Amino acid sequence: MDGYIQIYTGNGKGKTTAALGVALRAAGAGLKVFIGQFLKTQSSEHQALKRFEDLIKIETYGRPEFIKTPSVEDKNMAKKGFKSCMDSINSGKYDVVILDEINVAIHLGLLNLEQMLVLLKKKPKDVEIILTGRYAPKGLIEMADLVTEMHEVKHYYHKGIKARKGIEF
């Protein structure tokens, strides 16, 4: 099976959720999935994915706080995560590799766009790659085979409703 490059971007809710949906569908078909989550710590999906640990591996490279100005620690975690994702893409172990919030990590300057473009150009033909996060760079969009932009039409956050465990995290 050929592997393609997908991007889920935009200011709307559902980018990670869409990628996790692909992971679940892939696992249901017996495919092996690696998920690298940038700028995040463990959330509710980790508990659910433990049930599929023979098919889905998930790692996080972040801290609980929202990042406005990246620290050296943030950059080091992002670099570690990028290496882990790169190794997973090239390992021959995984059919699908998800780099969750990679677009934001690039936007914040934690990772280099050129390194990402080189990685995608050299990816094995049979590995599906999914990139998520706001601010997808033009270079990634041009290289991708499928790009979906999530657009917020209405969101309860604007009414003061906070993120809820099990729904948003």
Identify the residue ranges that each predicted region occupies.
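Conserved P-loop
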Residues: 2-90
